[in-house]
Amino acid sequence: MFVFTNLAPEHIESHGSFEQYLSDKKRIATLLSDSSKKRRVAIINGDDPYADEFTPKKVTEVVRYRLEEAKIYSSDQTGTSFQFDGATIFSPLRGEFNIRNMLAAAHFAKAFGIETPIIARAFSKLKTIRGRGEQVTLPENHPLRNKQQFEIVVDYAHTIESLEALYKTFQGHKKI
């Protein structure tokens, strides 16, 4: 099984150049083609410009997913609702980047025979990772909790792509 989510110019310093980084990452896809396993499944983010380059040639199945398949219903402070495999999925995670990752994970789970209701239940219980789109609020029992008229989001985004994705998720908010 191979899952390709995206490729962005990150960790270049470890590879020397973007071209070398691309080559090193493509080697991972090649490992699936060369595998002796009977079932070799590649799950590919079809929205990424490098999708074709990361689609292994000798596999038994290629699953391409796109953001448009998610049919996003809502995205607000409580989370995101979207469509997957005929079911409405809710997750407390926000942003298209998280939906893309959930689509990859959902297709991965389906490839292993996990049913959609189980996937939906798991996604509904997801929590943000500290420092990645993490919302900070006053504690539930704090007397001023209901008067808090601002939202604090902590994110350690450090590339242009990740900052743009974060700003798109929290549009209209002031940024510091």
Which residues fall in each region the model found?
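Active-site beta-alpha connecting loops in nucleotide-dependent enzymes
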Residues: I129, I160-I176
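Switch II (G3) loop of P-loop NTPases
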Residues: I152-H158
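Acidic, Mg2+-coordinating active-site environments of NTP-dependent enzymes
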Residues: M1-E151, G172-H173
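Short beta->alpha connector loops
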Residues: D48-P49, H158-S162
